[in-house]
Amino acid sequence: MKKTGLVLALLCCVSLLFLSVASGARAQGDQFYKGKTITIVIGSTAGGFYDRWARLFGRYMGKYIPGNPEFVAQNMAGAASVIATNHVYNVAKPDGLTVVMPLNGVYIDQIVGRSQVQFDLRKFSWIGSPSIEPSIMYMRSDAPYKSIEDIVKAKVAPKCGGSGTSSTDFILSSILEEMVGAKITSVLGYPGGTEIDLAVEKNEVVCRSHSVSAHFGREPFDTWHKKGFDRHLIQTGRKRDARAPDAPTLLEVFERHKVPEDSRRVARMLLAAGELGRPMMVTPGTPPERVKILREAYVKVLNDPKARDEAKRSRMDIEPTSGEELEALIKDIFDAPPELIARAKKVLTN
């Protein structure tokens, strides 16, 4: 009995010590964020869906973080958000006060070894993503290309706008060129989606690829659709979106062109950006208890009735992915066989 009592006493002491440490960590978190400001660095220009989501989180996350910090949004567009990601990786302190929302294809630039990349995405702590984002390619309706087959047969390649080599615009165009023989001229360097859409209106370029949710969720597309300004050529979702029933899926096009499985695996890796959605990450080295606080607040925002209503009114779809799931996806991407990564590099550098 004495031995049993001693064991119980020791267990109680250990439990109390654990609770004390946990409470202390939470108290430190409470104390740390009080009176502080968290900066959300956005890897694109104002007005697009990345910007919208960042500002929505900025309006709601503070009330779910102990100490109720303020949030500010900072747009840092350029090089398909490589500039923003470099900044948060190399300049921002690892204190939980700076998060970044880069374009979801930013991992591509690291995979292919672009010289501008000064980060390792595997070292970030991933907070979450509000939605999964399949893509769609649109074309000016007055351009002489009514389908992907027209682009394959084209004597003059259409010009498609993009922000950089990790943008959906460039990735999907490169896949179509390499795997089905499409002819596309990518015009890169636009700061963000808003500028590409303006270039399409000016007829500087005639096509663009971006998320389905943005294409059916904001201007100028609402007006374009009413006027018949654009048509839809292809989409990357598993099935056709009800809003674009005329556009075949990439899988359908692959079937038609008998694209082999090894090429399809490369395409899946390059289009994993859609699974990443619109991710938020925090500086590498941020204390785990602060990462936990940010992740919990992120989830609570996506369950907040007012935040959900605001997202719905703005036609921003909610299909969240946790930070842990995003980290696992990034690990899978970078753990791909060397031959698969080599083929991906070939697709994007041809």
Place the predicted regions along the sequence by residue.
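Bacterial N-terminal signal peptides
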Residues: A9-S20
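Hinge/capping helix and adjacent helix->loop/strand transition within the periplasmic-binding protein
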Residues: I38, K63-N68, H87-T98, V106-E204, ...
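Short beta-strand->loop
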Residues: D120-P130, K183-G189, P220-A273, S322, ...
